[in-house]
Design a protein with these regions (language model features):
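Structural motif corresponding to the C-terminal cap of alpha-helices
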Residues: 27, 31-34, 51, 55, ...
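Generic alpha-helical secondary structure signal
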Residues: 18-22, 46, 243, 247
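Short, surface-exposed loop/turn segments at secondary-structure junctions
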Residues: 33-41, 256-263
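Short, well-ordered secondary-structure "scaffold" segments embedded in the functional core
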Residues: 57-304
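Short, amphipathic alpha-helical "recognition" segments used to contact nucleic acids or chromatin
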Residues: 42-54
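Charged, often Cys/His-bearing segments associated with DNA-binding zinc-finger transcription factors
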Residues: 1-35, 85-88, 290
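Short alpha-helical segments in extracytoplasmic peptidoglycan/chitin-binding modules
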Residues: 16, 47, 61
């Protein structure tokens, strides 16, 4: 599949041929991933991408690759570990001098890092733990904090919290000073947040009790004023985090499916998918843009 057409490679592995081979080279040179006696790095990475991209069960890969289940599991684990070793390189805050683009969405928020919110991702846990992981929509999820920039790249993620936990509680945990991977907003910078978070240093929320909907204003010639205008501009820019989450879960289907991995491995897989997401965003391709059009269409037709 990675030696065929670009379209076939993207459909199966969610990366173009060039990006797939670039990823394999990176995992070889920087992470120490090696060919085994019978399995190349390319085959290992392809098996991993099939599992996370299509939520294919490893047993299904036995017939395709003529490998034992033990071999597939071992190589999946090796690729997962290799990707996680790149976490600090791909998921990090920008330099202190980075500025938001001067476009119609972000020119009002020049010192913004981007936007943040919580993202619920399906997980499978023991029956005894399901109450803690059940969110307000009754789904069994982990609540992941995601901070994204204007290019839809993750700057910081914290998966692992139970789905019943509020977004603000996850953010407080991320900012604990005794965390080795604490989320620290550089002085003079801030993130756009929704009304569920508190306005304060480093966080810019919309005016409360002011109604606004992007679709309503887009269809009207009337211009909103004062607080409504601010909230409209805020929402237009902050929408990047919602677009990112939808794209993230659409591209890596394992994030929308309950899998039979241990919960700790499920969280590690989420982090690895964040690395893959940023890797792909750094190497944008027209096929990624087509997928993004699907995302925007879904959001445009979603109920308010």
């Amino acid at each position: 599949m990675y030696d065929g057409s670009d379209v076939a490679c993207y459909d199966q592995l969610h990366l173009t041929k060039r990006n797939f081979h670039d990823l394999c080279t990176m995992l070889r040179e920087r992470c120490g991933l090696r060919d085994s006696v019978y399995v190349t790095v390319e085959e290992k990475v392809a098996m991993f991408l099939l599992v996370v991209g299509h939520s294919i069960k490893m047993r299904m890969l036995r017939g395709t690759y003529k490998r034992s289940l033990w071999t597939i599991r071992t190589h999946f684990s090796d690729v997962l570990t290799a990707l996680l070793s790149l976490y600090g390189e791909f998921i990090k805050l920008p330099s202190a001098t980075a500025q938001a683009p001067n476009d119609y969405k972000w020119k009002w928020f020049g010192n913004a890092l981007g936007a943040l919110d919580g993202c619920h991702i399906d997980v499978l846990v023991d029956v005894a733990d399901q109450g803690r992981y059940r969110n307000r929509k009754q789904a069994i999820t982990t609540n992941m904090l995601g901070v994204v920039d204007w290019n839809m790249k993750f700057l910081y993620v914290l998966p692992g919290w139970e789905g019943s936990v509020s977004d603000s509680r996850v953010l407080r945990d991320a900012m604990r000073t005794n965390r080795q991977d604490a989320f620290v907003i550089p002085k003079g910078k801030y993130c756009l947040v929704d009304a569920g978070y508190t306005n304060g240093e480093g966080f810019l929320a919309p005016f409360r009790s002011t109604r606004y909907h992007l679709k309503e204003w887009a269809a009207s010639a009337q211009q909103p004023q004062t607080a409504k205008l601010y909230n409209l501009r805020h929402s237009c820019a902050r929408n990047v985090v919602e677009r990112t989450f939808v794209l993230f879960k659409k591209k890596w289907d394992i994030l929308r499916s309950q899998t039979f991995f241990d919960i700790k491995d499920q969280i590690r897989i989420i982090s690895a998918c964040c690395v893959l997401h940023n890797f792909a965003r750094d190497r944008q391709h027209v096929m990624d843009d087509l997928l993004l059009h699907e995302v925007d269409s879904e959001l445009a037709n979603a109920p308010n």
